[in-house]
Amino acid sequence: MPRKGYIAKREILPDPIYKNRVLTKFINQIMLDGKKGTAESICYNAFELIQEKTGKDPIEVFETALKNVMPVLEVKARRVGGANYQVPIEVRADRRQTLGLRWLVGYARKRSEKTMEERIAGELMDAANNTGGSIKKKEDTHKMAEANKAFAHYRW
């Protein structure tokens, strides 16, 4: 932990096309090796694919997908008297969003479609419909928290 207090969070600029800050975070999550232009083109092409396939506004699909993927509870390891307990805790709003974005991109990368645009589009559409890998991850996280509810009194 820092001794001189906490560092202020950097302000994230909204993306150039949709003027959305959360979308900028999503693009940053897609980005590899600092290639932001490539990440932006992947994201915007994926949004065009979503527009073609669903006929809905891609930003709405993205926001619905993110809302469906964001976890409410997670478990954190806590050592008590020589034993490690998985203690369920509520997820802070900023971490909830970060985890949702990370899971969406992570499970999109694991998909079998040919291009990254197709993978991102597929994962976003699946998550908006409450299916797909990222939704399964959220459900597994919630199941773990539910299974370890008995240790909730170890919260700190």
From Swiss-Prot:
InterPro entries: Ribosomal_uS7 (IPR000235), Ribosomal_uS7_bac/org-type (IPR005717), Ribosomal_uS7_CS (IPR020606), Ribosomal_uS7_dom (IPR023798), Ribosomal_uS7_dom_sf (IPR036823)
GO biological process, one term: translation
Key words of the record: Ribonucleoprotein, Ribosomal protein, RNA-binding, rRNA-binding, tRNA-binding
GO MF annotations in UniProt: rRNA binding; structural constituent of ribosome; tRNA binding
Gene Ontology CC terms: small ribosomal subunit
PANTHER family: RIBOSOMAL PROTEIN S7
UniProt name for this protein: Small ribosomal subunit protein uS7
Gene designation per UniProt: rpsG
